[in-house]
């Protein structure tokens, strides 16, 4: 029997999760919600995806456009086993009462506070913690990126300091910036470090800057080691870590632009780069300090986590069975 999945919010994350659900043989996409009949809503309908209004207050927008919806979010909740909340940050907490009333499990995204869910989740780090849970939060794109690589070396970690160089907006976002400035997060630590600690118990401090780019985040990471680790050890660990890929400047990967072009060359949907990209040349060990630089595709790295979280919540697969299944279905390289 397939798990019936609904998506509340069919935007950057929602449409990617919806696509990923359709690639699973143990899940069924029942429908998605929209607040207005925009091009994404029309595209969903063209793909045969049932579209629902996010609430009754949005119905007039669809009626005015002659766009026929299947009902509202409440109607969708009656048909699903789980809802993936991909609404803007803060909305998930407000929506939770609807999910509770409907008796439906829910997955929230990283824009929500950790308290909204029973567990914060990154599949390879704490899959077991989500087993049987009703409410799970998939952490943000940046936090997912940090956890993927730091979890792989956590037995060696004494203290982490990471600088987050964040993209200003997603490619289709015309409302955010800056477009001609570098904007620091003047509160130290930034929220990313404490967010990592909701998944793995390590000592970490982070600072963050927003820069005028749309395609990826970059992290510069320094790790103080509590036991010896060589550069070759780290390379070997990362090469054997799922959803982490090593890229070399020598082979033309000089910036995030080439990383996204690589995803395009793979013919990935929306040029998704689900894997965290680590520059091999940046991996260096000086004394008891490890340095490396990684890039995160903010639109897609959390997508496989949503799929794995669904399986964990319904306890239909063990950790590595789910991860391997998700990886294969999405064409994740390792």
From Swiss-Prot:
Matching CDD domains: GAPDH_II_C (cd18127), GAPDH_II_N (cd02278)
Known EC number: 1.2.1.59
Extent of the signal sequence: none
Pathway stated in the Swiss-Prot or TrEMBL entry: Carbohydrate degradation; glycolysis; pyruvate from D-glyceraldehyde 3-phosphate: step 1/5
Transmembrane segments: none
Source taxon at top rank: Archaea
One Pfam short name: Gp_dh_C
Residues where NAD(+) binds: 12-13, 111, 167, 298
Means of activity regulation: Insensitive to pentalenolactone, an inhibitor of bacterial and eukaryotic GAPDH. Activity in vitro is significantly stabilized by potassium citrate.
SUPFAM superfamilies named in the record: Glyceraldehyde-3-phosphate dehydrogenase-like, C-terminal domain, NAD(P)-binding Rossmann-fold domains
An example Gene Ontology CC term for this record: encapsulin nanocompartment
Disulphide bridges, residue numbers: none
Keywords associated with the record: Cytoplasm, Encapsulin nanocompartment, Glycolysis, NAD, NADP, Oxidoreductase
Gene Ontology terms describing biological process: glycolytic process; lysine biosynthetic process via diaminopimelate
Subcellular location: Cytoplasm; Encapsulin nanocompartment
Reactions catalysed, as given in the entry: D-glyceraldehyde 3-phosphate + phosphate + NADP(+) = (2R)-3-phospho-glyceroyl phosphate + NADPH + H(+); D-glyceraldehyde 3-phosphate + phosphate + NAD(+) = (2R)-3-phospho-glyceroyl phosphate + NADH + H(+)
Thermal dependence of catalysis: Thermostable. Has a 44-minute half-life at 100 degrees Celsius.
Binding site for D-glyceraldehyde 3-phosphate: 140-142, 192-193
Active site per UniProt: 141 (nucleophile)
Protein's job: Possible cargo protein of a type 4B encapsulin nanocompartment. Active in the presence of NAD and NADP, prefers NADP.
Family listed: Belongs to the glyceraldehyde-3-phosphate dehydrogenase family.
Complex and partners: Homotetramer.
Protein name: Glyceraldehyde-3-phosphate dehydrogenase
